[in-house]
UniProtKB/Swiss-Prot annotation:
One of its GO terms (biological process) is organic phosphonate catabolic process. The gene is phnW. The keyword Transferase applies. It catalyses: (2-aminoethyl)phosphonate + pyruvate = phosphonoacetaldehyde + L-alanine. Belongs to the class-V pyridoxal-phosphate-dependent aminotransferase family. PhnW subfamily. InterPro entries: Aminotrans_V_dom, NH2EtPonate_pyrv_transaminase, PyrdxlP-dep_Trfase, PyrdxlP-dep_Trfase_major, PyrdxlP-dep_Trfase_small, SP_NH2Trfase/AEP_transaminase. Its cofactor is pyridoxal 5'-phosphate. SUPFAM superfamilies: PLP-dependent transferases. Pfam families: Aminotran_5. Keywords: Aminotransferase, Pyridoxal phosphate, Pyruvate, Transferase. This is 2-aminoethylphosphonate--pyruvate transaminase. Coiled coil: none annotated.
């Protein structure tokens, strides 16, 4: 494993030896010890948002998108209407989920380098009283842009609407306090800023909203109301849980708390991001976003304009030097992305910058 490349991606990402070792134990899915492990994970997750008094944590097998679909399908009534705020690929995915689920929805899309504003949301809600819910990506992973969650949340509350937050790439690293930011649901997953492995999503659902959601869901497996009710009654998952993923997340959360919790995790990622931005700028590579809206999670860079630059060749050469990057996901310009999260520090980020510089020299890329 010592020769494995460092994953500079938004997840899955590089995990610690301790986290990987936690998966070497097999668990019985109905066993009391595993039930206690699940309960401990949910309790620790709720503590990160100070949400124990207001929200339930409902874990769900699968990727983060499974949990997003479950949240929309469970909490948005079939006669509800969702306003989907879009400035990237994952906002577009929210809209596609609403379409597939048969939920009425409207969209508001800004450019990929433009955050949605509270004023936008205020105007849109005033224009359409049929809207019941607003769905927002906190950190849009396709670029790394940070949308102004606190301001938008207050506007939504003032209009008497309900907020669903996709916090997949921000939860655990960027502060979100359930006592200060009103939301009906917040969705995240095991394999992002918590530095677990992928395979489990979770939804923080407002207690009263979840209680009222019986019968809304389009799916048996993705019914969060039923999932929570069964867990509350038995302590068990309804269907086979990802036991090793839960065990890894439990260990990752222990390390998260040892590191100093959210403030420390945020600071390390912020240091990683600064090292990356400064180093790439010295090479001549330009970041796609201005600093004031750049989250310290993943950074999008403009690709070199030199004809000798080809991403696949660039990717393989950087990988051979020990780092896995991420392709761009923008529609208008060619880019690539570098993650700042996972078990990596500023020294590792500087080594990645050095690898990129070496590869560009090897490829004789001059026009950057």
């Amino acid at each position: 494993m010592s020769n494995a490349p460092i994953l500079l991606t938004p997840g899955p990402l590089t995990t610690s030896i301790r986290t990987r070792q936690a998966m070497l134990v097999d668990w019985g899915s109905w066993d009391r010890d595993f039930n206690q492990l699940t309960a401990s994970v949910c309790e620790q997750l709720l503590a990160i948002i100070d949400g124990a008094s207001s929200h339930h944590c409902v874990p769900l097998q699968g990727s983060g998108t499974f949990a997003v679909e479950a949240a929309i399908g469970t909490l948005v009534p079939r006669d509800g209407k969702v306003l989907v705020l879009i400035n990237g690929a994952y906002g577009q995915r929210l809209a596609k989920i609403c379409k597939v689920l048969g939920r009425t929805y409207s969209t508001f899309e800004t450019a990929e380098d433009q955050p949605t504003t509270a004023a936008d949301v205020d105007r849109l809600l005033a224009e359409d009283p049929a809207i019941t819910h607003v769905a927002l990506i906190h950190c849009e992973t396709s670029t790394g842009i940070l949308n102004p969650l606190p301001e938008i949340a207050q506007v939504i509350k003032r209009h008497g609407k309900r907020l669903i937050i996709d916090a997949m790439s921000s939860f655990g690293a960027l502060p979100i306090d359930a006592r200060e930011i009103p939301f009906e649901a917040l969705i995240a997953a095991s394999g992002k800023c918590l530095e677990g492995v992928p395979g489990m999503g979770f939804v923080f659902a407002e207690k009263s909203a979840l209680a009222a959601a019986e019968g809304n869901a389009h799916s048996l497996a993705m019914d969060l109301h039923d999932q929570h009710a069964y867990m509350a009654k038995t302590g068990q998952w309804r269907f086979t849980p990802p036991t090793h993923v839960v065990a890894a997340l439990h260990e990752a959360l222990q390390q998260y708390n040892e590191e100093g919790g959210l403030p420390a995790r945020h600071q390390r990622y912020a240091d990683n991001c600064k090292t990356l931005l400064d180093g790439m700028a010295a090479i001549g590579l330009r970041s796609f976003l201005p600093a004031e809206i750049q989250a310290p999670i993943i950074v999008t860079f403009h690709a070199p304009t030199d004809a000798r630059y080809q991403f696949k060749d660039f990717y393989e050469r950087v990988k051979a030097k020990g780092f896995i990057l991420y392709p761009g996901k923008l529609t208008q310009v060619e880019t690539f992305r570098v993650g700042c999260i996972g078990v990596v520090g500023a020294d590792g980020m500087q080594a990645a910058v050095n690898a990129v510089a070496e590869v560009l020299r090897e490829m004789e890329v001059l026009d950057i």
